[in-house]
Amino acid sequence: MADAETFAFQAEINQLLSLIINTFYSNKEIFLRELISNSSDALDKIRFESLTDKSKLDGQPELFIHIIPDKTNNTLTIIDSGIGMTKADLVNNLGTIARSGTKEFMEALAAGADVSMIGQFGVGFYSAYLVADKVVVTTKHNDDEQYVWESQAGGSFTVTRDTSGEALGRGTKMILYLKEDQMEYIEERRLKDLVKKHSEFISYPISLWIEKTIEKEISDDEEEEEKKDEEGKVEEIDEEKEKEEKKKKKIKEVTHEWDLVNKQKPIWMRKPEEINKEEYAAFYKSLSNDWEEHLAVKHFSVEGQLEFKAILFVPKRAPFDLFDTKKKPNNIKLYVRRVFIMDNCEDIIPDYLGFVKGIVDSEDLPLNISRETLQQNKILKVIRKNLVKKCLELFFEIAENKEDYNKFYEAFSKNLKLGIHEDSQNRTKIAELLRYHSTKSGDELTSLKDYVTRMKEGQNEIFYITGESKKAVENSPFLEKLKKKGYEVLYMVDAIDEYAIGQLKEFEGKKLVSATKEGLKLEETDDEKKKKEELKEKFEGLCKVIKDVLGDKVEKVIVSDRVVDSPCCLVTGEYGWTANMERIMKAQALKDSNTGGYMSSKKTMEINPENSIMDELRKRAEADKNDKSVKDLVLLLFETALLTSGFSLDEPNTFGSRIHRMLKLGLSIEEDDAVEADAEMPPLEDDADAEGSKMEEVD
């Protein structure tokens, strides 16, 4: 062998190795799954390359994974005839360059995640150190010579050109020198069970080098001769009886042979009725690196002008990086006639279904298809359309079981709402899957379909309110009249609801109407209409006074027919942002500051003519239009309405000061008795004309 070069592990990898070696994990068995998975990936790569250049397979025409337990040396060897690694690959991939998932995996472990998640973070190779204290990797790539990588995980590793070892032709051989307490992993039975449990559905043959003891039977001729010579015992017997009574001598002989462990053909090629739940679960785990079983599965084939088979899985929970836009999707593996092509095809499924895992095997796509030509491929567009249709079918199947659907909705409701926003073609279908709390649903969630069945006679609109939380909206002044008249209102309290509802204008012909925007019209009797007109006339003067005081803060002031108990509320324009949307947009770190100006609707102040505060204010305004207490109370009511209507205050301190002044008035504390710190506080307008000019208006 040539001289060895020594390299130091990159700091994060060193930390990871230290964590793996020094922490006790009960499920160390996952190392085999990870190493077989890596071998499978290497085989995928060489098979893909060979589609356009058959000579790539010359070094080793067969594609396989071999597992060799060695009880004499206490080693476990895994060999694959995959693409192999160059010297640069060895140095970079196995030690000096940390993958992006290294740090995230350590953070996940620290947060109590299971070590079996290691494959999801792209650092599965290092799981070998769960069971081995030394690992030797021999590898041969078509573009380089054969090299040996070796490390006991003590902070460094060596790489040597292999001049004397057995030639691999092409591929990788990994020898694990097992720790003393991990000898179970050289037991045939244990290894077979592990392959069947975790790697049954790998697309390449996985063979185990097994020891067989066979017994050879040799007839004992000498004993037979003695029998024949015995005196007085010569009898006539038939030939069959003679054969049965022949004595045999057994000799034990030990042999070795390859035993194929994963005998199943690809699961998607079998009929769904032939596959049990456990097989689907095992396939899902090997496909997704998840340690939990799936929530639901859809196995189907499409035939006709276009042929493909697919299996789609819905996980039980959302992955940690579900909405990570920088991460390439790898949820659907694309095969062409059983040959793996790629697992990061962005065009095969829309973003909002990025949580669905699965495999698609097409009979029609060309084997040598590239990512560039995929984008233009009409067949792929048809496959995508079918996958979306089948995903939605699967979600409706999950919805038949309330408990399962609650789990699904908790994990993936944001994806469905994103679908409403993005997928105009299936918007109506996705809308049927949405669930909300409402004024009549209690702790249960209700669907739009169920809402429609409960609608009052003559009701033609679906009412909803958006806000920060259920608690924040359930006692909103906007709901007072609706509740009083017996209308059900949906609570849309997820930030993404604002975006989704902007696209979902109606459901089953019923318009969706916001309780917080202009344009809310409720059915009225003739008496109610007459009374409303009278009150409108009676409070016209006060509306004008309030508008004069507030100026540009509001677009108009009108008599409300939506508030029953509260003195007033602030509604937004039908096509502008709601208070909740304004709050969401203000929280956007990279927002366009110019957008806020024209999208933040002008507010309309609606006053409640039957509220005692408003009635008293009307009397004061009629008695003296210039009464300064009217101005102060109007400002206070406006700021309070901002809060109860879901807006934020631009100057909360000034609002606080007004409240404190009110408290002093209520407690009959004279201004002279106030502490000096209150000197800057805006006084109430009725205290003194001179001080009135100090009053600050607040937006």
Curated annotation (Swiss-Prot):
Q: Which residues bind ATP?
A: 34, 38, 80, 85, 93, 99-101, 120-125, 172, 371
Which NCBIfam families would you find in this protein's record?
PRK05218.1 (NF003555)
Subunit-level organization:
Homodimer. Interacts with OEP61, OEP64 and OM64.
Tell me the keywords, alphabetical order.
ATP-binding, Chaperone, Cytoplasm, Nucleotide-binding, Phosphoprotein, Stress response
> Region entry Disordered: which residue ranges?
219-248, 673-699
Subcellular location(s) per record: Cytoplasm
Function, as annotated, reads: Molecular chaperone which stabilizes unfolding protein intermediates and functions as a folding molecular chaperone that assists the non-covalent folding of proteins in an ATP-dependent manner.
Q: Please note every region of biased composition (Acidic residues).
A: 219-228, 673-690
Name used for this protein in its record:
Heat shock protein 90-4
What do the Gene Ontology cellular component annotations say? Answer: apoplast; chloroplast stroma; Golgi apparatus; plant-type cell wall; plant-type vacuole; plastid
Q: Which organism is it from?
A: Arabidopsis thaliana
Quoted from the entry, the domain comment is: The TPR repeat-binding motif mediates interaction with TPR repeat-containing proteins.
Q: What PROSITE patterns does the record point to?
A: HSP90
Q: Assign the protein's first listed, main location to one coarse class.
A: cytoplasm
